[in-house]
Design a protein with these regions (language model features):
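Non-catalytic DNA-recognition/assembly elements of restriction-modification systems
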Residues: 1-19, 137-153, 164-208, 335, ...
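Sequence-specific dsDNA recognition surfaces
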Residues: 7-19, 27-63, 197-212, 226-258
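A generic structural signal for short beta-strands and their flanking turns/coil linkers
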Residues: 23, 87-89, 219-221, 238, ...
Length: 383
């Protein structure tokens, strides 16, 4: 097994888009979820109104990876994906197949081994990213081609199994959304004739989080907008730390049952909402609103309501756009209309979701085990 510069094993490709008629799908770095496109986060653009970063065209067989430091996003381009426009925040490459199997190159670019070197060699004053000069510093171990093909076949098999697990997770989420509509109907048409109110009528306390910056080695864990998923889950796999005076803690810490509303983000992500379901004390960041509800509504019901497709459309229409971000402030959030089914029916929905979450947990565990196996194989060959 020999060592080579990674640019010996791949060629940087991609170009600027030619003028086109009608609309195309624009895929930003934020629209790629690790290894697949989340179409809920894409935009339809024309040639003339596309964002300045929507300036990368690709071909079938290319591989994309995000240039940004600390970002794991890798995409294999098939025929349908080749029709889209991509952000210049991606680097497009193609395998030098005399040295590197194309399928294995994809897995390598998604591996911890590559990402570690990418981050070490990234540069930039504000947002660090890998450049061509940085790529020239990355050295990898290269097995012979027959060994590469065997490894790629094993990794592809693991990926297929992981994809099936992810499909199961999506199905569980859709099941919960369908059950919500079945029990309560859509809003504002309110076909079941429930009592209506505004969020202001059902809250006991509404506060912004702290505007203080995260610090290395801070005393408290810091819950930020990135810890709320688009689907309405709490994800604490990547948390920061913060120092904050004791007299400010009560105003900006979270407790079990708090509803967390992301007030500032890109336009498509404003309004992401989840319920804090942990006992650990965490400090809340300022781009998130902490909502404590009255007994008229269950926190899980309010969160599910704000994460429905009809609420997502409403939030998209009401948020105020600024350069690079959009916003819904606390007063505007409280003006949102809502229906109020009986709490017993709300509880029935919450129990259904809890049972579904248990099934999701089992699938997620299987997914984690496959991820460990995949990393073990990559470590064996490239570590």
């Amino acid at each position: 097994m020999i060592k080579r510069n990674i640019l010996d094993c791949m060629t940087i490709v991609g170009g600027t888009p030619s003028r086109f008629e009608g609309e195309k799908t624009y895929v930003s770095t934020g629209a790629v979820d690790c290894d697949h496109v989340d179409y809920a986060q894409t935009e339809r653009v024309t040639y003339d109104n596309r964002p300045s970063r929507a300036n990368l065209s690709v071909a079938e067989g290319d591989i994309l990876f995000a240039k940004m430091c600390g970002t794991k996003k890798t995409l294999r381009i098939d025929r349908p994906l080749s029709e889209h426009l991509y952000s210049t925040g991606f680097c497009a490459v193609r395998a030098n197949e005399s040295l590197m199997d194309a399928a294995l190159l994809y897995h390598l670019l998604a591996s911890d081994q590559f990402l570690t070197q990418k981050d070490q060699n990234s540069s930039g004053a504000t947002q660090k990213a890998i450049t061509n000069a940085g790529l020239r510093k990355i050295v990898i171990r290269v097995p012979d081609l027959s060994e590469q093909r065997k490894l790629a076949a094993n990794l592809d098999c693991i990926e297929q199994m992981m994809a099936k697990r992810r499909e199961q997770l999506v199905s569980f989420d859709q099941l919960v959304k369908s059950r919500f509509i079945e029990l309560f109907g859509v809003y504002p048409s309110n076909p079941k004739g429930w009592e209506t109110a505004t969020i202001r009528d059902i809250v006991a306390d509404v506060r912004y989080g702290s505007s203080r910056p995260a610090v290395d080695g801070g005393k408290y864990p810091y819950l930020r907008m990135n810890n709320i998923t688009y689907g309405g889950e709490l994800d604490l796999t990547d948390t920061k730390r913060i120092d904050i005076p004791d007299n400010e803690l009560d105003k900006c810490t979270v407790r079990r049952g708090d509803v967390l509303f992301n007030r500032t983000n890109s336009k498509e992500l404003v309004g992401k909402t989840c319920v804090y379901n942990r006992d650990e004390m965490m400090v809340l960041a300022g781009f998130v609103i902490r909502v404590r509800v009255t007994e008229r509504v269950l926190p899980e019901f309010l969160s599910a309501f704000l994460n429905t497709d009809f609420s997502k459309q409403m939030l998209l229409g009401m948020c105020k756009a600024a350069i690079g971000q959009a916003n819904i402030n606390a007063q505007e959030m409280q003006n949102i209309g809502i229906y109020l089914p009986p709490t017993e029916l709300q509880r029935q929905f919450v129990q259904f979701k809890e049972q579904t979450d248990k099934s999701k947990l089992a699938v997620q565990k299987g997914l984690q085990e496959l991820e460990i196996l995949k990393k073990s194989l990559m470590q064996q060959y490239f570590g």
